[in-house]
Amino acid sequence: MKINELSKLTAINTETIRMYRNLGFLHPEKLENGYYDYSMQDYASIIHLKKLRAFDFSL
């Protein structure tokens, strides 16, 4: 899925998703056109990160 779709599903803005990717928390496939394809595993990772943040864990 595209970053905008993932953003809508998780209620996390695209800049935060990019930061999570750059920090190595997400591992989307990079397509030939340069876009990233986020998987359901990336979705699950964001949900897990949201739970950690709710308990004041720092990233």
Where are these regions (language model features)?
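Basic helix-turn-helix/winged-helix DNA-binding cores
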Residues: 1-59
